[in-house]
């Protein structure tokens, strides 16, 4: 047992030391890569084709792009990929793939005829109408020289009626507010603006910390000599952003970058959920990170980078970490994100988030605040099968359920928690792991193990539940590879993505929580 502890601690120490380096790590994005290829490709052909080939390799067997577990997240990357690949269609197989993508979009229309759910991907009400407009514009612009094929999509707009109306409302609100650089609306700049305003460039050198928005801004700037310095900075931003992905290839872009505070606050929060923040062997690398997080937390909160506006999710994670580490924190910093009955990431949000609210409530619980008034929110949101799902920031119900159970573990709602444990029991795969795609994944198994370990420490598990926990822990041990991060995309933004270091922090925290817990018994 001591050997695995030593290995896990060494791995965790290396992870903590690297948090926030080079702006953070992020999985590659189909949407942002497609937009960069379409709107502002690198002039070097040797860099374009790796991105084209990568895009082609990401197409699913049903013809679409994106994770099949989240159908509503797939239309935007699929449309973006179609429009980008039309310009680079030199093989019959690519053309056949585009035809399949066209059929996929037709089949997907049924999802958009239903009422819109709360877990729409970020900016979907802006991005999908924008991509539909772009597709319509290109189809009726026959003189586009760099489009070798004409692929008539002929997508009916009626099924998107509710989304388009929501988008028009959102655009009008944005235009009234005239957003500043480094604010949430600018993250989706490409969907509501067309004038290359240099005032919107933030400290990263890009637009809204978004490769897609930055590529669109560069396209709009059209090599304007009066914007020479700004254009050079934005081009450098795209080069640096491409280095943040696991592909590390020019033109292959993440969905957001830089994300150092998101990576730092959420990774350290994962340690809090595992109860290992005070473990002696990590303090020399941990304390500088926590001290850095403390100085970064301002009265308005903290964002996913120092150059982006504060949000409630990163703020809740940071506050929880600092309180758990013994730092004094003014809770007004967190409470400003409360909008009855939830906590919000950004003021003016249209959909609430259960996971964000759970994290904020957990932070308040750590601070000794009476959190009983929030318990009923979680109980009312519980599904009939005992789980919590439908969150706007993560597609996995295991993520949401994990964080709600941690927020509820000191509550009197034992029946609700037992029902959630029963849901975990039902959905555990025969191999002992968990995953929403009919196979076990590391990060989702880590969520389940962390939830169960927290309930075990609260005395809420029976022998069968502990056996379930042990099977999940064994699965993590069998599939653990020291110093090698896995990539499974279940976080939700403009499209589904994976912040690798954060997921690794959850994995290591889950394994250490159980391992150290066993040593205490």
Swiss-Prot record:
Enzyme class: isomerase
Entries under InterPro entries matching the protein: SQ_cyclase_C (IPR032696), Terpene_synthase-like (IPR050148), Terpenoid_cyclase/PrenylTrfase (IPR008930)
GO biological process, one term: diterpenoid biosynthetic process
Catalytic activity: (2E,6E,10E)-geranylgeranyl diphosphate = (+)-kolavenyl diphosphate
Keyword Lyase set for record: yes
Cofactor(s) recorded in Swiss-Prot or TrEMBL: Mg(2+)
GO MF annotations, alphabetized: kolavenyl diphosphate synthase activity; magnesium ion binding; terpene synthase activity
Keywords: Isomerase, Lyase, Magnesium, Metal-binding
Binding site for Mg(2+): 311, 313
Record note on domains: The Asp-Xaa-Asp-Asp (DXDD) motif is important for the catalytic activity, presumably through binding to Mg(2+).
Role description: Involved in the biosynthesis of (+)-O-methylkolavelool. Catalyzes the conversion of geranylgeranyl diphosphate into (+)-kolavenyl diphosphate.
Protein name per Swiss-Prot or TrEMBL: (+)-kolavenyl diphosphate synthase
Organism, scientific name: Herpetosiphon aurantiacus (strain ATCC 23779 / DSM 785 / 114-95)
């Amino acid at each position: 047992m001591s050997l695995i502890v030593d290995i896990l601690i060494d791995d965790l120490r290396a992870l903590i030391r690297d948090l926030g380096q080079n702006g953070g790590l992020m999985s590659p994005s189909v949407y942002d890569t497609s937009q960069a290829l379409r709107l502002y490709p690198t002039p070097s052909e040797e860099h374009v084709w790796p991105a084209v080939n990568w895009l082609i390799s990401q197409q699913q067997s049903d013809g679409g792009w994106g994770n099949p577990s989240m159908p509503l997240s797939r239309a935007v990357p699929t449309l973006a990929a179609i429009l980008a690949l039309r310009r680079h269609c030199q093989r019959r197989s690519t053309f056949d793939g585009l035809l399949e993508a066209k059929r996929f979009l037709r089949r997907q229309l049924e999802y958009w005829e239903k009422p819109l759910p709360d877990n729409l991907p970020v900016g979907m009400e802006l991005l999908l109408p924008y991509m539909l407009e772009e597709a319509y514009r290109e189809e009726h612009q026959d003189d586009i020289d760099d489009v070798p094929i004409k692929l008539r999509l002929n997508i009916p707009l009626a099924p998107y009626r509710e989304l388009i109306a929501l988008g028009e409302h959102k655009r009008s609100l944005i235009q009234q507010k005239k957003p500043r650089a480094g604010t949430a609306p600018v993250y989706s700049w490409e969907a509501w603006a067309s004038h290359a305003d240099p005032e919107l460039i933030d400290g990263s050198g890009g637009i809204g910390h978004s490769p897609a928005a930055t590529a669109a801004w560069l396209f709009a700037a059209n090599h304007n000599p009066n914007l020479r310095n700004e254009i050079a900075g934005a081009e450098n931003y795209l080069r640096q952003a491409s280095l943040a992905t696991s592909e590390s290839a020019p033109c292959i872009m993440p969905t957001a970058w830089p994300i150092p505070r998101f990576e730092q606050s959420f990774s350290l929060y994962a340690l809090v959920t595992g109860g290992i923040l005070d473990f002696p062997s990590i303090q020399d690398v941990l304390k500088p990170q926590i001290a850095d997080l403390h100085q970064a937390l301002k009265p308005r909160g903290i964002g996913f980078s120092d150059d982006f506006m504060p949000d409630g999710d990163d703020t809740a994670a940071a506050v929880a970490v600092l309180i758990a580490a013994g730092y004094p924190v003014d809770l007004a910093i967190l409470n400003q994100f409360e909008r009855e009955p939830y906590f919000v990431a950004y003021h003016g949000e249209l959909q609430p988030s259960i996971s964000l609210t759970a994290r904020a409530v957990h932070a308040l619980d750590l601070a000794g605040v009476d959190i009983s008034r929030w318990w009923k929110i979680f109980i009312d949101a519980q599904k009939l099968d005992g789980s919590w799902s439908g969150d706007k920031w993560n597609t996995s119900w295991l993520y949401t359920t994990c964080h709600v159970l941690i927020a509820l573990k000191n509550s009197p709602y034992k029946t609700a928690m037992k029902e959630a444990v029963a849901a975990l029991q039902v959905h555990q795969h025969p191999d002992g792991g968990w995953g929403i795609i009919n196979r076990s994944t590391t990060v989702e198994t880590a969520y389940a193990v962390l939830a169960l370990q927290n309930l075990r420490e609260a005395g809420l598990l029976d022998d069968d539940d502990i056996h379930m926990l042990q099977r999940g822990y064994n699965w993590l041990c069998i599939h653990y590879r020291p110093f090698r991060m896995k990539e499974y995309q279940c976080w939700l933004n403009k499209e589904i993505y994976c912040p690798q270091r954060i997921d690794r922090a959850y994995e290591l925290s889950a394994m250490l929580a159980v391992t150290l817990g066993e040593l205490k018994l």
